């Protein structure tokens, strides 16, 4: 292997890690019938003239396995927080008690569980596509480089190995999430 061409595999790995991090965020937004503070992460509240994450206007807690509470710091925002949760598409019916909003998490029926596993599969496929796009970028860099056939084969093997590792991580996370969703 000559010293002429060095592929930045750290950059490729960092970008593939980004796809995994994005997948985790998408998976966290899927309601599994189990209470989790992370399920409210995508909810944005119209507070003080700007769209603000819910955790910046109140404290999110999970006091029970099927209950999430939001203790809103500013009494004037309670209705806006309640509206944001109601309109978030999470299928949760908020109950207000002063500045505390209680979110009872209903059990999921079998049909909804199956729908959510399909959604999780779609998220995982999007992550696989993102990983493969990074792989293609790496392969394109190798093809554009003026390097020997042996060097090109070495780098292509390294990129493929990295890709396989990340695709397996996506598949493992999907399997775990689907088991979590289907668990009654």
UniProtKB/Swiss-Prot annotation:
Tagged with keyword Nucleus: no
Q: Which GO terms describe its cellular component?
A: cytosol
Q: Does the keyword Cytoplasm apply?
A: yes
Q: Where in the cell is it found?
A: Cytoplasm
CDD domains assigned to the protein according to its UniProt record, in alphabetical order: RRF
Where is it predominantly found?
cytoplasm
Q: Which UniProt keywords apply?
A: Cytoplasm, Protein biosynthesis
Identify the InterPro entries for this entry: Ribosome_recyc_fac (IPR002661), Ribosome_recyc_fac_dom (IPR023584), RRF_sf (IPR036191)
Report the domain of life of the source organism. Bacteria
* One example GO MF annotation: ribosomal large subunit binding
User: Known NCBIfam families for this protein?
Assistant: frr
Q: What does this protein do?
A: Responsible for the release of ribosomes from messenger RNA at the termination of protein biosynthesis. May increase the efficiency of translation by recycling ribosomes from one round of translation to another.
Name the protein family.
Answer: Belongs to the RRF family.
Please identify the protein, giving its name as recorded.
Answer: Ribosome-recycling factor
Q: Please report the organism this UniProt entry assigns to the protein.
A: Jannaschia sp. (strain CCS1)
Native organism taxonomy: Bacteria, Pseudomonadati, Pseudomonadota, Alphaproteobacteria, Rhodobacterales
